[in-house]
């Protein structure tokens, strides 16, 4: 069986078709609004640390900075950051995530200022869309949802199909 993914990007919408043996299996259309939807993944930059809240604000390109709490960094934050640094150092080379090493978990009672610094780049995923005057809410525990499984890199403790 051969699978083919066809993506058509137009000024007002994006269409995606999944073909298996030249037969349409799945079709999706989305408007090209610049909305920040739940599940979107961005490379953000730390704008401001808030030690009193144990959180920080991250610039992901939205008009308001997004909010990232220390507990939303996830236990494998150091592993994510090491892998991200590797990828960003040489963007032309492929770094399979299967070859990435797992580092010790971050301290559950730790402080945001001990882990992050202003200007640092972090890979984040939106968990709550922006509302009113507030920007989006973020997490560093990335998850990729598929039809039969949810992939969470560096998280091998739970595997369900």
Question: Where are the regions that the model predicts?
Answer:
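Single-stranded RNA-binding surfaces
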Residues: 1-159
């Amino acid at each position: 069986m051969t699978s083919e993914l066809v993506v058509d990007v137009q000024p007002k919408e994006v269409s995606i078709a999944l073909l298996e043996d030249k037969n349409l299996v799945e079709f999706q259309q989305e408007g090209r609004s610049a909305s920040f939807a739940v599940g979107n993944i961005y490379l953000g930059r730390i704008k401001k640390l808030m030690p009193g809240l144990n959180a920080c604000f991250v610039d992901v390109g939205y008009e308001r900075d997004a909010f990232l709490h220390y507990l939303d960094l996830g236990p494998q934050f150091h592993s994510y950051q090491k892998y991200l640094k590797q990828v960003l150092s040489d963007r032309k080379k492929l770094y399979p995530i299967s070859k990435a090493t797992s580092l010790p978990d971050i301290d559950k009672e730790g402080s945001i200022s001990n882990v992050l610094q202003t200007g640092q780049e972090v890979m984040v995923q939106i968990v709550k869309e922006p509302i009113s005057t507030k920007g989006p809410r973020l997490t560093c525990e990335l998850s990729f949802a598929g039809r039969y499984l949810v992939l969470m890199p560096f998280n091998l403790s739970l595997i369900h199909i």
